[in-house]
């Protein structure tokens, strides 16, 4: 039952329509806060969850997860970026230790080779695409676009139409060419990498990693020649690798991102001007929402929280089951 002071104020509210009332901001927040605490007391702290977003600022994302974890004492906090680009975070943190782009977009003007995979860049990231198109038109960089369909960006460079669900296959084929032709950067590998020999043996002994395999895939036989060409350009020039949701929203998304980072490390295309790894995020603060801890399994700065919460699909199941009573 409502507290006496809130109940008294409800009676004075002006009707907006048959379902809603007009109410001052201070009163509505007080009412919402009371209801959340009422749910917590009746059903426990796990009956509440928070769903953040990747279009908010870093500051608001930090305060949001702090409210869920510290004020409501619930571990259930998530945001939409975990669904779309968590494979980039996982793949990059596993291989290079940090799940973020490694260089600024203006490095596009300083690179010699651009590879774009799984991204309709002109539509989704037009400011980035403008830089790519300028570099391709000015012939300061070669451009290779790898996708399951033809995109507008491919008009300005080489287009590789690949089979559906073949991202990891194609990336391993690029690695096979670089390894078999010894185009890798031995100095960088010796000073910066571990596990190279095991990785090399794994790729070279995988029959599906040889681009010759594409001769057996009807309609894609031409990739037997195109994939090695892209791989050689990537290995022998200052190169940047861009990818989008066409990589990450697949079952093998994390592994595909790891394959991309492996390519950059063994060729030394990271940590220098005009080289690097560039995940193209779906919203304006995907990186910040994750960095500040709006994830069920990470706190701010990717610290491990005291309790791991549920992810969005699990939370929806819990709502249907009647176990989650409130979501903010």
Regions found by a protein language model. Name each.
Residues 1-183, 191-205, 223, 227, ...:
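N-terminal export/assembly segments and adjacent metallocofactor-ligating motifs
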Residues 202, 227-238:
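Core structural elements
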Residues 75-76, 178-186, 251-252, 267-274:
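Short helix-capping/linker segments at secondary-structure and domain boundaries
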Residues 49-57, 216-220, 244-251:
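Conserved short loop/turn motifs at secondary-structure junctions
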Residues 16, 114, 155-156, 209-213, ...:
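Flexible glycine/proline-enriched surface loops and loop-helix/loop-strand junctions
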